[in-house]
Amino acid sequence: MEGYTTLPSTATLKPSPFTVSISESKLQTLQDLIRLSPIGPADYNNSSPSTGSKYGIRRDWLINAKKQWEDNFSWRTFEKKLKKYPQYTVPVKGESGETIEIHFIALFSQRQDARPLAFYHGWPSSPFDFLPILDLLTNKYTPETLPYHIIVPSLPGFCFSGSPPIDLDYDMPQAAYLLNNLMIGLGLDGYIAQGGDLGSGISREQAAGCEACKGFHLNMILLPPPANMKELTLEEVEKKAMPNALAFRQSGMAYALEHGTRGGTIGLALQASPVALLCWIGEKMMAWSDSSSQPSLEQILETVSLYWLTDSITRGLYPYRRFASGNEPKINFIEKPLGYSFFPNTYLPCPVSWAKTTANLVQYRRHESGGHFAPWERPRELLEDVEEYVDVAFGKKDSPMMGPKAVEDVSGSGSHARGL
C-alpha cells in the first residue's frame, strides 16, 4: 500500500520489506496430515446431547471442520489478505543480549506530529487480527492525514518473528523490552502500547518499565480480585459478567496450566497434528468470543493454519511459565495514563473499579457486548476507544461524563509507586 512506507528520519534500525509466502511443500505436508488424521470415537464428553460444549470440542463439529479444511480451504486466498499492508522484518537486540528477528505490519504516517501506537496481539491470535482496524484507519485517513504511526508486531516466537534463544528462560518482560527497542529503533520514541491477553501484559510491562512508552490502552486486564473487592462497586453489566470470570477460574484455566507447566509436551504434541491444533485453538476461539460475534469456520481454519505453518504453538508458549509459577506477580500502581475498554464476554472481565487500583485510569469505555478478540469482534468500537484515549490522555479532549457506552471521567488516584 503506497504512501505508508516512509520511516521517521530518526530511525536507527533498517527493516527489510517482508512478504508472506509459504512454500508449496509445507502446504502439501499440512494437507497430508489433515487427510491422514483420524478422529476419535464418540463418547459422553464429545457427543452427549446433554453436555453441549461443557467438555470442549464436539465431535460432529470436528468432523465437519476437518472436511472443510481438507476439501475447501485455500491458504493462498488467505495469504493474499495477509499481504494487504506493508510488512517488515528487522533484527532487534534484547536486554539479555539476545537478538531476535521481529516481523511487523506498519502504517507510517507522513505527518510530523504523528503519535506512535503499538498494537500487541495475544494467544491464540496474531498481528493479522488487527487487519480490520487497519482497514478502518486507511478508510478514514490518508498517509498525509493519519495522526498515528501504527506498528503491529508478531510477538517473539509467534508467526513470522524469530524465536527466543533455546538456552534462555524467556519471559514477557524480556519480550516487552525487546519490542520497546523495536519502537525506539524505528524512531518512534514516545509511543503508546495497546493490547489484550498477552498483549495487555506486554503493554503494562512497557508502561511500567520503559521510558519511551508514554501510556497504554488495554482491552483486557489480567488481575486477581483485589483484597478490598467487597468494598468496590460494580456496574450492572460488570455484575452480569462476573459469572464468566468465576467459571473460567474454576474450569477454564487448564490450558494455561498445561502451557505453563508442560509447554514442551503440549507444544510438540499440537505441532505434530494440525487436527489436534484445530481442537485446541478452535475451542478457545469459539468459547472466548461473544455469542453475537462468533468466528466463522473459515476464520478458525485461517488462524490454525497460520499457527501450524509458522510453528507458533511450539515457539509461543513461553509467557505461560510465569502465569503457572504459582506466584502471583506484584501489581504496583503505574502513574502513566491508562485507557480501558471493557468487553463483558471475555473470559476474565475486569471491572473498572478494579482497573483503577492498578494505574492512572484516565479514560474508560464500557461496552454491552464483545469478547476476548476485540480487534476482530469489535474493531470499530476498539479503534474509537483508542482514539478517544489518545485525545484524552494527551490533551486534545476532556473526558466527559456520558452514557453507558461512552467515555467516563475516571481519572485520579493517590500517591503510588510505579512499576510492576
From Swiss-Prot:
Source organism superkingdom: Eukaryota
User: In the Enzyme Commission scheme, what number(s) does this protein have?
Assistant: 3.-.-.-
Q: What is an annotated GO biological process for this record, any one?
A: epoxide metabolic process
> Pfam families, per this entry?
EHN
Which residue stretches, if any, does this entry annotate as coiled coil?
none
What EC class does the entry list?
A: hydrolase
Would I find Coiled coil among this entry's keywords?
Answer: no
Q: In which pathway does it act?
A: Mycotoxin biosynthesis
Please tell me whether the keyword Hydrolase is annotated for this protein. Answer: yes
| UniProt keyword list | Hydrolase
Gene Ontology MF terms? epoxide hydrolase activity
Alphabetized PANTHER family for the sequence: EPOXIDE HYDROLASE 1-RELATED, HYDROLASE, PUTATIVE (AFU_ORTHOLOGUE AFUA_3G08960)-RELATED
Q: Which family does it belong to?
A: Belongs to the peptidase S33 family.
What does it do? Putative epoxide hydrolase; part of the fragmented gene cluster that mediates the biosynthesis of dothistromin (DOTH), a polyketide toxin very similar in structure to the aflatoxin precursor, versicolorin B. The first step of the pathway is the conversion of acetate to norsolorinic acid (NOR) and requires the fatty acid synthase subunits hexA and hexB, as well as the polyketide synthase pksA. PksA combines a hexanoyl starter unit and 7 malonyl-CoA extender units to synthesize the precursor NOR.
Q: What is this protein called?
A: Putative epoxide hydrolase
- The protein's organism comes out as Dothistroma septosporum (strain NZE10 / CBS 128990)
Which gene produces this protein? epoA
